[in-house]
């Protein structure tokens, strides 16, 4: 069915559902799974990145460290210790542009992305509203392959069945 699947990692927990879907599709199709993360250009040119732990990464080590963080994070969710059919790529630039450029260059069959979530204060902290951010919108509109956008279970609509048909 698919030969190459591109999963767009945005480092938010909500994209874990998208990763699980991408991994499942890759396993079923015996496809290569490529995990890509694009570090936005405003960070790339600042010369350094400060993590939330206060660690400072210099510009030359940003991509290597980020690739290591992604490998540790995603490989811990896979049963195999060192899967051969999974590759991690880190790029710098405008995320949707770099995702599309990479997908075209690699002749990707499917792009899998998570949706952006917005907490709904009117309905409580547990209710999330699905939202397509700029990157998901642009990738969906411009990709030359299929795009699969995955929401978390908290984002699913809850329809009540009306059995009274008068």
Where are these regions (language model features)?
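Small/aliphatic-rich secondary-structure junction motif
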Residues: 1-55, 85, 166
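Short, well-ordered secondary-structure micro-motifs
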Residues: 18, 45-48, 100-101, 123-124, ...
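General small-molecule cofactor/ligand-binding pocket signal
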Residues: 36, 87-91, 148
């Amino acid at each position: 069915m698919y030969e190459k699947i591109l999963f767009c990692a945005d480092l938010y927990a909500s994209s874990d559902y998208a990763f699980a879907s991408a991994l499942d599709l890759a396993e079923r199709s015996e496809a290569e799974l490529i995990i890509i993360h694009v570090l936005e250009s405003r960070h790339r040119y600042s010369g350094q990145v400060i993590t939330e732990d206060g660690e400072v990464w210099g510009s030359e080590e940003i991509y290597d460290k980020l690739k290591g963080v992604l490998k540790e994070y995603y490989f811990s969710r896979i049963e195999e210790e060192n899967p051969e059919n999974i590759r991690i790529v880190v790029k710098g630039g405008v995320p949707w542009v770099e995702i599309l450029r990479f997908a075209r260059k690699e002749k990707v069959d499917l792009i899998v992305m998570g949706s952006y979530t917005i907490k709904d204060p009117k309905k409580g902290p547990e209710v999330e509203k699905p939202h397509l951010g700029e990157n998901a919108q642009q990738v969906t509109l411009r990709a030359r392959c299929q795009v699969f956008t995955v929401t978390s279970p908290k984002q699913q609509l809850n329809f009540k069945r009306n059995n009274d048909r008068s």
